[in-house]
Swiss-Prot record:
Organism: Schizosaccharomyces japonicus (strain yFS275 / FY16936) (Fission yeast)
Annotated GO CC locations: endoplasmic reticulum membrane; GET complex
Gene3D superfamilies per the UniProt record, alphabetical: Helix hairpin bin
Record membrane topology: Multi-pass membrane protein
Function of the protein: Required for the post-translational delivery of tail-anchored (TA) proteins to the endoplasmic reticulum. Acts as a membrane receptor for soluble get3, which recognizes and selectively binds the transmembrane domain of TA proteins in the cytosol.
Gene Ontology molecular-function annotations: protein-membrane adaptor activity
Gene that encodes the chain: get1
The protein's name in its UniProt record: Protein get1
Keywords, in A-Z order: Endoplasmic reticulum, Membrane, Transmembrane, Transmembrane helix, Transport
Regions crossing the membrane: 4-23, 108-128, 153-169
Subcellular location(s) of the protein: Endoplasmic reticulum membrane
PANTHER family: GUIDED ENTRY OF TAIL-ANCHORED PROTEINS FACTOR 1, TAIL-ANCHORED PROTEIN INSERTION RECEPTOR WRB
């Protein structure tokens, strides 16, 4: 019974982690990577963003009617910075997709890998017994796949069933 609850809680944890926590941790992991990687793409992206915001602030403080020459110069500078920033933004987004995929893959391997190891090591152990006469022989055989004795529910079948119940209910 303890093993049955352990497997159910493991599947519940993996489902809740994937649904609610994983995206947040992937984004935070990317932010940490971007801050401490020392990559010139991220540095120039942040520098351009700060220059763009500073120029936009200056542009908003200047009246277009009273100081047209200054406003036009700032507007041209803002447009040039905006074009550079958009180009740099595409580069950073491509790099961020790669880093986020790597972090997501790591989380997937850790969560699914642990479940796979538990399932593999306990593949011959039954989770619980099905009462005699409740199901036909072919159904008992199917529930015992891959290695449990006929008449018992295997770890693989229990994991599959608990995953489906959890994903349906949550």
């Amino acid at each position: 019974m303890d093993f049955l609850l352990f497997l159910f809680c493991l599947n519940l944890f993996i489902h809740l982690f994937d649904k609610y926590v994983k995206t947040f941790l992937v984004n935070q992991g990317f932010r940490v990577y971007a801050r401490f990687s020392g990559s010139p793409e991220f540095k120039s992206y942040n520098d351009l963003r700060l220059q763009l915001l500073s120029t936009k602030r200056d542009l908003n403080n200047v009246s277009a009617q009273d100081e047209f020459a200054k406003w036009a110069r700032l507007n041209r500078k803002f447009d040039q910075l905006n074009v550079k920033w958009e180009k740099q933004s595409k580069i950073v987004s491509q790099k961020s997709e790669g880093v986020k995929k790597l972090i997501s893959l790591t989380f997937w391997i850790v969560t699914r890998g642990y479940r796979f190891i538990v399932q593999f090591k306990n593949s011959g152990n039954p989770v619980f017994a099905v009462p005699e006469g409740m199901l036909p022989t072919w159904a008992l055989w199917f529930l015992a796949l891959p290695k449990a004795k006929t008449g018992y529910v295997s770890v693989a079948v229990w994991n599959f069933a608990s995953q489906k119940v959890i994903s349906t209910l949550l």
